[in-house]
């Protein structure tokens, strides 16, 4: 047996959490910090100094030499600048370790060097980071040493949000405020806050690092641009939940330990559908902490993989022909006195509060399906969505048989007198127990599915931050809650008003419910008849952010200003254009410097073989046929390469970033696909096989 691991002892040991604060802070200071965490507000300068000193002392005792304001700019990954704790030496030349409350609360990175969509120019560089007191500081150890990481928000000198966290925190306040209005109407006077909770299921690939380093396309783009299918892929369906191989198991073990030390509740691990694909799922947490922890998970996966001679691939579609990777975003809302607003109970037809919440969510998703789709838009996700492995690009809601039956009754009669029950599942084996059976099945093809006491948003890409999807979810549901509360707070007869409102919302927005096969062509046709948007690509979703509907929504709840939304639309176009340009240039480079020279060399060998066989007095029928085929494909590839070079140059020279991004989508990408198709039949030497294991 291996050494026994005491998970309880190591969990959170590298986190400055509430337990550590309680031990190290004076009682009155701890109470003030806890109050600000729970109710908002600011710490007094004196309190901030005490907290900063305690945090610094704890970090230094654990080997830290530097601290950083750890934030999430609009690149989608985290950013950090390390400052050491050293201060001015005293008169005796002794170094003093310093860290003030001001340094804890505020930092000042260069705002012009991050994506801003025009909010910051090069000569307007000042930006600020602000401590997110609700997300605990943690220690990160790597080749640079031990660093104290302080989760922060990031904004410009003029106050615009330049990150993913600030809008998320704003949206959390919005949904809390509006949800409280609803629960108050149902007599709950104890709750003071409603929290959005999130649990993201992170999928990823692991490949051997040495094989990875031989692939220029994987290095530069995160996915293979050339290659042929492996003889065996996922056809036998034997990888999903299969036995975890030793090398991968060793990686997972180290990953768990690293994450547990960082306070990340890594819970579930298993093989996924595609060869070399795996999943890690944590326990639910408050939305902003879940976002921070998901960034930590992705970063730690990459670091631990290197240690094991592996490379972690987070791209949504690193290999054609097998499933890509997503990040199912499980979302629920809970009061601080312990009530999950998405828990239907044993008899959901009698749970009026749940039915109102459900009706509001149906309304929110129907009205803002375009925004929800945009929140999961990503360059890599364009290759994954709607490919019989992931949800379609059409937003719909799966409720299951039980809730759909309740909704049907409410629409038809205004009340639901019954609901379907789960019953028992008989195994037919005397030594096995009869199993409690859920009242409804699960639908893996739905992009937004109710799964018992939460909604699972399955569109999110594996490499993407979960901040935007949860910001959007919180915002659109907050709006629906607000509009419902506006009606019900004025009602003379609350019981009648709430029943009428539930029926109204469900009747008007029933079109968004779909319990069938989301992969089918019939659903695409049906969705069009229902008037549901089918937004197929990242850049086609960009302008949904700046419609009047979207601007009114986000400005009403102070989540985004119009300028912030316009900047994000601009960044989407820029990101898309740059990403596709990198792929095109990588493809050009590989074709011109690696593949075509290899084909030429191969054809030379074939030509020599033809001559040698002829010289031996035998007709080289097969060899000549193969040589002709290779030369024909070589000519096609060279011609296609010339077209791609021309189209890439034309697109990269464009100045209008929106027009440029669509040029890449409509012209450059098809040129890339054309060149790939000319090569596949003959270039057996380019096989990019999916490994059965890393």
Task: Name what the model sees in each region.
Residues 678-683:
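Conserved small/polar residues in nucleotide/adenosyl-binding loops
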Residues 125-314, 323-326, 333-572:
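Glycine-rich, acidic/polar active-site loops that bind/position phosphate-bearing ligands
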Residues 430, 466-472, 494-677, 694:
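C-terminal low-complexity, glycine/proline- and small-hydrophobic-enriched intrinsically disordered tails
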Residues 1-8:
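Basic/polar N-terminal segments that are highly enriched at the extreme N-terminus
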Residues 685-687:
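Hydrophobic topology marker
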Residues 47, 71, 100-101, 282, ...:
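Active-site proximal loops enriched in glycine and acidic residues that flank catalytic Cys/His/Asp
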Residues 10-125:
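Active-site core of metal-dependent hydrolases
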Residues 76-92, 109-112, 215, 222-224, ...:
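Short linear, low-complexity motifs centered on an aromatic residue
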